Design a protein with these regions (language model features):
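Conserved HGGG/HGGXW glycine-rich cap/lid loop of the alpha/beta-hydrolase fold
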Residues: 9-68
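Flexible "cap/lid" loop of the alpha/beta hydrolase fold
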Residues: 104-109, 114-144
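Acidic catalytic loop of the alpha/beta-hydrolase fold
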Residues: 218-223
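Conserved alpha/beta-hydrolase catalytic His-Asp/Glu region
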Residues: 128-133, 147-206
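Catalytic active-site module of serine/aspartate enzymes centered on a nucleophile-bearing elbow/loop
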Residues: 238-273
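Short beta-strand/loop motif that positions the catalytic acidic residue
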Residues: 208, 214-216
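Gly/Ala-rich beta-loop-alpha elbow adjacent to hydrolase catalytic centers
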Residues: 95, 99, 103
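Conserved acidic catalytic loop of the alpha/beta-hydrolase fold
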Residues: 74-91
Length: 273
């Protein structure tokens, strides 16, 4: 558990094997309003065989909130700078939602840094215009009321109906609601604005030659199956997997399914090297 100065921000990261140069590296990039914690179950599962690095984007989790630098291009530059600072030449890159926006840009602009690309609950398109007014209202509510007051409204965006209804997941729901409520107002507003205002990169996906896995929850309302299918059709040779009973946060909702699908994909990639 450390922080490192990346561009003009102190970036928080966790590194399971900071001194191990023998293992292949998996880098995990989280979604909007979350942090590296959303990959706890993946890091625990994969750290025996891989060096696992999970980090918090600026303004989120335990990373510093800065005045600017929240557009997807800047976050991509931050991520490459983090890899450089940690001495990571190549890695398996896993990005969920906003982390997937960044992951796709890395694959397009810095393909030499990737062993593989895994995209979870994400999109290559700009924000759907019909969603923008609702997100603007959400930002206004956060600005005036704070994250704690609006977090209950965010839960159905982040999680599917299976997770939200399961009695045995009550403690999990309470834990992740608390994580949402802990978001800092300033960082949340800046990061959300960066997501809303992002440019689409769909037309560039054909340039991606990196082995790619696309994962989507069958209950994902924020970036539904059709978004993942579009990416799948655009990236030659990519694989598409559906996680049953998961919404927009499959790493938390159905970690065993995600770990199995991701593990099988990584095993195949590792066999090529």
């Amino acid at each position: 558990m450390s922080t490192i100065k990346v561009n003009n921000a102190d970036i928080y990261y966790e590194d399971s094997e900071p001194n191990d140069s023998q293992k292949s590296v998996i880098v995990f990039a989280h979604g909007l309003l979350w942090s590296s914690r959303m990959y706890d179950k993946q890091v625990e599962h994969f750290k025996k065989d891989y060096r696992c690095v999970a980090f918090d984007f600026r303004g989120q989790g335990q990373s510093q909130t800065t005045k600017d630098g929240y557009d997807m291009d800047s976050l991509t530059q931050d991520t490459i700078a983090l890899l450089d600072a940690l001495g990571i030449d190549k890695c398996h890159f896993v990005g969920l939602s906003m982390g997937g926006f960044v992951a796709q840009r890395i694959a397009i602009r810095h393909p030499e840094r990737l062993l593989s690309l895994s995209l979870l609950e994400t999109s290559a398109d700009p924000e759907d215009p019909k969603n923008i007014p609702e997100y603007r209202k959400l930002l206004k509510a956060i600005r005036w009321l704070g994250m704690k007051r609006v977090s209950q409204k965010v839960m159905p965006i982040m999680f599917g109906s299976t997770f939200l209804a399961a009695k045995e997941r009550k403690a999990d729901r309470k834990e992740w609601l608390s994580v949402l409520q802990s978001n800092r107002k300033g960082g949340t507003i800046k990061a959300t604005t960066g997501v809303i205002d992002r440019e689409g990169i769909y037309e560039q996906l054909g340039d991606i030659q990196t082995p790619t896995l696309i994962i989507v929850g069958d209950e994902d309302a924020a970036t539904p199956y059709t978004k993942s299918e579009r990416i799948h059709f655009a990236i030659d040779g990519s694989k598409l997997a559906i996680i049953k009973g998961a919404g927009h946060t499959s790493t938390v909702e159905e970690p065993e399914q995600v770990n199995r699908v991701l593990g099988e994909f990584l095993d195949n990639i590792e066999g090529w090297y």
